[in-house]
């Protein structure tokens, strides 16, 4: 797996970091603005430092420490870390890394070894008992230590804890095999581990005595829970310490730790152990911190009064760590103090002096910090941020009915923010206020207000009949307007985002939705993502599946399968319409048909013209084929189509070819242009296993088109609801009209350069299974039946849940799917934990359901989609002169090359890959959507956030930022003059603007 190549400003930053290391400045902060590719720079730094060490070091070791396993796996490819070295959730614990380190070293790493790690930052080594995998590995190593030869069973019981014996033994066997293989490969794993254990026990003899005493007890499992837990945690700490000692890195990269003070404060956490080892004890190890916000970038006066600490204290703490030298620290504090004093007295008449002081402070900071920013925001459309959400009768009723219930139960005021954030609150919320309501109702026994309410709870009966569920919430209605294009263009009929540069025009639902984008929603409340996922997906299903029910067979069509008629229930459970030979029609990558359609040769035509030309070629092919094979006309069947394609390729057919049915030319034309397998074959045609890879990817499309919601879409568009034989033909037509080849080619371009197999893996990971969320309905709340579940497919929720292997994998699957052209089209999330994750490939709409309290949090949210080659960049360039046909080989590479030549001029590569010039004729922009109610405080809060964002960079490292902001505001400064006071730490900008302070624009 190769790392991605850095662009010019990234290369300049990597060179600067290397220069600092050579000057013995071993601690460097890379604080590029969110979304500018800090990981790519880190990869370049790795290579440069490795080349530097090659003169005296025969093995270069890099430890990449990431705060989040999803971020780690996302960034492995960018760093060039082999897939086999990337982390599984179950093995991400620090105490398990000793085995991974030796396994990795045993592979053919030649000179350089990269070791990814994700410490459980919220997990204290003094609490819990660790994971079953963690304890199994400890036993698999420790039972080989001579002291425990006579205590195998009690040691196993101690570490088994409360895990099922059958699976416990299986886990131990698996690790025993890996240990034996690792020892055979390296020759020294077990001997090194035994030596390390001996050293530890010599330093902690009382701990060894305690473990042995436990093992001597007749019934280990009967010992007090606390004693066993403390013993297990002691063993975990021991193996974590051994892992740390075995790392011995030449370079440590710490990625996306948002608060440096939290990183170094953890006494017993895995992060704390790592921090002490690499940030405090080993002063000579090279450390690169990657974080746009290692300190709170902006503190309000309210935050300062609450905590006593804020931006200034955190900023100085980071700078003191980076300097790591008393003389350097003293010099920085003195220079920064002078700068702060002049800035606090900011006056237009003192401008020249202030610029000089700023330059001195900037130069001092540049000794250990690099930061590039993109200050141009021309690609942002903020018009929807000021649009007011209409207050409806239903909004008011949602509040009044809940407040009446609260009054009747003497429970005080119902939180108005909850009502503004979600409808049907008792269906979705799991907060304390609901518990109070439930408890009070159970005691009182009077449920009349709940029974009479139309807004507190969803009704299962209405959902089951696919009735329209009123939004009852202005914010949800705003989202529906965006996601479903106000029901004008049929966005609910899309299974993938229309190609930014289609190869031909159609009059289909895809052309009607040209420019359509996914929507990312941020909320402060955990209930909101679940509500959005459930109700938005239901609405999409109502507009498709429900439409079929309205058209025919309405009495049988039900949302909940168990309530459907017998025939409908069997149909849903058993029938997948693409199966057997009907599936093979769309999964066979016919090489002969692939040659009949070359997208760039027939580009920029109507689909009818493309079909006519390709159909002519198919007719010529079949005419010649009939003459040589003496075939007769037969009835159309999928088996005959598969046999014909295989015979055309010179392959042994899977079915006997009896003849060619009338109309086969039209079907083969559709397949040549849009078959998932044939489109995938064209994508992979340079690979040695192109056919196999194409079939592999096409299988994912079969699963997609066999989903209930997909089948409904095809039936709504093409009819033939009950004809499975016609279904595969309709699917092929849908793929043609959806410009599937252009969609796959664009998607491949966004995924970057890796190998064909890596591209296939990433594309396959972009299809996510339909999941469901549990909700309370009126019927379940009143005790009439169990809770119900809403399917989520058009929209999904991404929110804090119990962190385990299953939820982490689901989270990663959702991220991959949202970053693909395929569903889901709406992702709703809480802000927490999303730092560093990309959501930009097909999303240019961001909706702030609730405004954050800090202006920088808003910038961080939007950095999820304002990134390299984001959807808005591609859509604009594709629709410009740079995306005009003809092209020679690659639409997207040539589009970017044309744009670079015309637009870059004296700018860095931020243009055109991240930004476009202010005078670019934008047709598509990143849309900031803030659904605010009229007369609410949200408008004032939003205006203040915008004011602060415009100049907060000027308050960097200042003790009372909000007061300074007010001072600047009153002076009525010219914005161009203020920008010259911004701290410039960009190596590219400083080199290309003679050390001045001009920023990339």
Residue ranges of predicted features:
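Helicase-associated low-complexity regulatory tails and linkers flanking the ATPase motor
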Residues: 1-25, 40, 44-827, 831-1001
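Conserved glycine(s) of the Walker
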Residues: 35-38
């Amino acid at each position: 797996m190769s790392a991605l190549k850095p662009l010019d400003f990234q290369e300049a930053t990597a060179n600067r970091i290397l220069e600092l290391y050579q000057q013995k400045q071993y601690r460097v902060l890379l604080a590029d603005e969110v979304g500018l590719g800090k990981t790519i720079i880190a990869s370049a730094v790795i290579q440069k430092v490795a080349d530097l060490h090659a003169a005296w070091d025969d093995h270069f070791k890099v430890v990449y420490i990431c705060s989040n396993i999803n971020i780690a796996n996302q960034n492995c490819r960018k760093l060039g870390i082999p897939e086999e070295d990337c982390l599984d959730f179950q093995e991400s614990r620090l105490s398990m890394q000793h085995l991974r380190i030796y396994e990795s070293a045993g592979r053919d790493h030649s000179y350089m070894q990269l070791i990814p790690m994700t410490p459980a930052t919220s997990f204290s080594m003094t609490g819990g008992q660790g994971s079953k995998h963690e304890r199994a590995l400890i036993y698999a190593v420790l039972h080989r230590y001579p002291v425990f030869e006579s205590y195998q069973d009690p040691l196993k019981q101690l570490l088994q804890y409360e895990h099922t014996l059958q699976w416990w033994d299986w886990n131990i066997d698996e690790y025993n095999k890996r240990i034996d293989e690792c020892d055979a490969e390296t020759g020294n794993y077990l001997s090194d581990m035994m030596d390390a254990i001996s050293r530890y026990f010599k330093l902690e003899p009382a701990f060894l005595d305690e473990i042995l005493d436990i093992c001597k007890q007749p019934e280990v499992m009967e010992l007090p829970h606390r004693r066993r837990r403390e013993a297990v945690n002691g063993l975990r700490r021991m193996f974590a310490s051994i892992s740390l000692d075995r790392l011995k890195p030449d370079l440590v990269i710490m990625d996306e730790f948002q608060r440096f003070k939290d990183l170094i404060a953890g006494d017993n956490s895995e992060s704390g152990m790592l921090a002490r080892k690499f940030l405090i004890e080993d002063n000579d190890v090279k450390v690169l911190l990657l974080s746009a916000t290692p300190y709170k970038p902006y503190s309000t006066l309210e935050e300062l009064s609450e905590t006593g600490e804020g931006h200034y204290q955190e900023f100085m703490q980071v700078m003191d760590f980076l300097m790591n030298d008393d003389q350097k620290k003293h010099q920085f504090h003195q220079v920064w103090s002078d700068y702060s004093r002049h800035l606090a007295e900011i006056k237009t008449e003192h401008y020249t002096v202030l610029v000089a002081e700023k330059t001195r402070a900037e130069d001092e900071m540049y000794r250990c910090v690099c930061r590039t920013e993109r200050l141009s925001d021309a690609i942002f459309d903020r018009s929807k941020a000021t649009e007011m959400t209409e207050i409806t009768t239903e909004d008011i009723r949602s509040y009044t009915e809940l407040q009446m219930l609260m009054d009747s139960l003497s429970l005080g005021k119902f939180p108005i923010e909850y009502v503004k954030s979600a409808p049907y609150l008792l269906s979705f919320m799991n907060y304390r206020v609901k518990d109070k309501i439930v408890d009070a109702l159970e005691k009182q026994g009077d449920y009349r207000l709940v029974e009479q309410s139309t807004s507190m709870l969803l009704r299962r009966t209405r959902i089951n009949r696919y009735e329209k569920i009123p939004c009852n919430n202005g914010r949800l209605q705003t989202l529906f307007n965006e996601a479903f294009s106000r029901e004008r263009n049929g966005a609910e009929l899309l299974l993938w985002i229309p190609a930014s540069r289609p190869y031909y025009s159609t009059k289909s639902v895809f052309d009607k939705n040209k420019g359509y984008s996914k929507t990312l929603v941020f909320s402060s409340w955990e209930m909101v993502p679940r509500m959005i996922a459930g109700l938005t997906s239901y609405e999409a299903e109502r507009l498709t599946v429900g439409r079929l029910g309205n058209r025919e067979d309405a009495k049988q069509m039900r949302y909940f399968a168990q309530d459907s008629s017998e025939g409908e229930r069997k149909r849903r459970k058993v029938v997948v319409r693409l199966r057997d030979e009907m599936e093979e029609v769309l999964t066979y990558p016919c090489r002969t048909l692939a040659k009949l359609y070359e997208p760039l040769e027939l580009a920029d035509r109507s689909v009818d013209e493309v079909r006519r030309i390709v159909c002519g070629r198919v007719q010529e092919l079949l005419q010649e084929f009939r003459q040589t094979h003496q075939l007769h006309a037969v009835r159309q069947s999928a088996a005959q189509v598969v046999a014909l394609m295989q015979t055309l390729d010179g392959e042994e057919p899977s079915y006997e070819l009896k003849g060619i049915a009338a109309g086969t030319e039209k079907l083969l034309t559709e397949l040549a242009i849009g078959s998932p397998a044939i489109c995938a074959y064209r994508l992979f045609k340079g690979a040695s296993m192109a056919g196999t890879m194409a079939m592999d990817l096409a299988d994912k499309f079969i699963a997609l088109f066999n989903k209930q919601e997909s089948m409904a879409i095809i039936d709504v568009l093409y009819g033939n609801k009950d004809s499975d034989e016609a279904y595969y033909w309709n699917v092929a037509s849908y793929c043609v009209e959806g410009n599937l080849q252009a969609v796959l080619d664009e998607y491949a371009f966004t995924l970057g350069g890796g190998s064909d197999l890596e591209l296939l893996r990433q594309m396959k990971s972009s299809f996510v299974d339909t999941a469901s969320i549990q909700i309370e309905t009126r019927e379940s709340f009143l005790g009439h039946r169990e809770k119900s579940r809403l399917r989520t497919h058009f929209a999904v929720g991404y929110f804090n849940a119990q962190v385990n292997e299953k939820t982490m994998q689901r989270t990663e699957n959702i991220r991959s799917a949202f970053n693909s052209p395929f569903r889901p089209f709406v992702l709703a999330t809480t802000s927490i934990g999303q730092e560093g994750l990309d959501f930009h490939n097909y999303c240019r709409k961001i909706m702030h359901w609730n405004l954050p309290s800090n202006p920088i949090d808003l910038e961080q949210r939007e950095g999820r989609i304002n990134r390299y080659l984001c959807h808005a960049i591609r859509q604009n360039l594709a629709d410009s002169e740079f995306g005009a046909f003809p092209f020679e080989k690659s639409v997207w590479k040539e589009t970017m090359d044309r744009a670079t030549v015309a637009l870059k001029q004296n700018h860095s590569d931020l243009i055109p890959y991240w930004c476009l010039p202010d005078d670019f004729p934008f047709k598509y922009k990143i849309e900031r959507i803030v659904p605010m109610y009229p007369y609410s405080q949200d408008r004032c809060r939003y205006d203040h956030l915008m004011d602060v964002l415009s100049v907060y960079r000027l308050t960097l490292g200042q003790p009372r930022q909000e007061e300074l902001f007010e001072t600047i505001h009153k002076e009525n400064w010219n914005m161009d003059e203020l920008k010259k006071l911004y701290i410039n730490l960009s190596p590219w900008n400083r080199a290309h603007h003679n050390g001045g302070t001009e920023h990339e624009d």
